[in-house]
Amino acid sequence: RMDGLGVAGALRELIEPGTDAEVPNALRAPVLQVAERLAALVEDTTGENDEDARTVSADSSSQTDDLPLCAVLIESRRRPRLVRHIGRALAHHLAAIPLGIIGVRGEPGRHDVGSAYRLAEVASSLTLDEWSDDARARLRGARVILVDDWTDSGWTLTVAASMLRRAGAAAVHPFVLAQR
């Protein structure tokens, strides 16, 4: 969280308007620590939403392990360099396949609006239109690490995850640097 202690100050500086740089050295170890915790969660899930699926039996754990792990980025209008750096680092660290970037069309949406308005803006702006047939095929049945720089309302992550699930991803796990 950007309003907390610890790395919050460094995160606030990194997310400031106009800043687009790679993750600074001071944040790299904490980012990888969070990535490790996320990896443990990814290994413990099957991607199903029901209560029974959250408890993976010994018989089904091998099925989960066989699912490919992919990294998908959400295009950033303000910090494309930062998001790509995070995505490459996570893919490398977690041995995930870099799969693609969810495109963003239209003008940037406002964050100071009601939830329904924000959802409508986000839903109309995210797209998989630029994805190749090969990338779409590799998405089917995959576990996905969804990478973005920060989140506020959560709608971008929710809509992007929904798009990926509808396109065939078995599970989607969000990863963001900061939460406002």
Residue ranges, per PLM feature:
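Short glycine-rich phosphate-binding loop at a beta-alpha junction
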Residues: Q63-S76, I145
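Short helix-loop-beta junction
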Residues: R88-I97
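PRPP-dependent phosphoribosyltransferase catalytic core
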Residues: T158-R180
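Mobile, glycine- and charge-enriched loop segments
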Residues: D134-V147, T151
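Acidic, divalent-metal-coordinating active-site segment for phosphoryl/phosphodiester hydrolysis
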Residues: D148-A160
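Residue-level signal for inorganic ion chemistry
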Residues: C70-V72, R118, V172
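Residues at the starts of beta-strands that form the adenosine-phosphate
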Residues: I97-P98, R143, A170-H173
